[in-house]
């Protein structure tokens, strides 16, 4: 069977996270996005565990509420500020891991994403001890990621590098970025939302399509490990330019700089603010390949833009959270079942019967790869622009649908 999976979210017990990030809300919103399995996130937090345990237990590591299945995950920050994503096979595994790290964390009961005074190798060793999967979260992000502080996997994970099976690309990178670094070729790439709110523009803005026998933790683990015929068949995510840290830019005024310009200015903007190195420039520093070399098993990467963002641009709204945008998004999802279906597969003529012409044309422009993206940087997301009608034939190649990828 084919499932869509988002393996990195946060609960309302994490800092800077919406109070609406409850199990009930996630279970309701995931199907409307087109997602079958959602990570719990924050599973070390005792209060969040109590909410998770309200779900029906499918097996030791898989839980069900409504139509949505959940698996146990968390993110932790090590002593070097590197974030790691962990997937657990059971609550007993979670409890064993928590017991090992509690004495190294001062906020394990107060923050869903705890700080742990251990390095990556030590955390990976504890993960291995409890049979959990571990890998770098949003690996290229310049603040709290592996490649922000390390130049290689082994620098971060030491002798446990061989145990690392996946890498989360993050919103400012895609497979073309990752596969310019040959040490990553053996790893499965994951694309996840890292959602801090359940809003359509955040939840499942990136996800993984997997071929599995059933929608359970063990089958998802086998897909990540590429075992028993299971695999990740498609990575779906934002164009890297939409990420907050794609290009090097000032974190105060968001002025963009080339790498040479930033170096010459000693990473200080003309406004006096700090210039933060972008993912694109960091990948260019790390890359040992001039162009991406994808291993045979690497799935295609499908770029996607959240439907609410497309609707907002079509209606001339400055925010994705206005009543007008919400109304049009809800109308479409009610008619076609999920956001993924609307963006990629629903018949455009049928869409035109449900929504206004401006929204139909915007969805069509996205499908045809004709949306212009102005890159993000310095902590500000990239923005999209809908081309004028006469410009649309010259912008980009046509965007494939999920069905197109399944045929290849």
Can you describe what each PLM-predicted range is?
Residues 15-17, 49-50, 144-150, 199-211:
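Histidine/acidic-residue-rich catalytic or RNA/ligand-binding cores of hydrolases
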Residues 2, 49-165, 398:
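Extended substrate/RNA-proximal surfaces in nucleic-acid metabolism proteins
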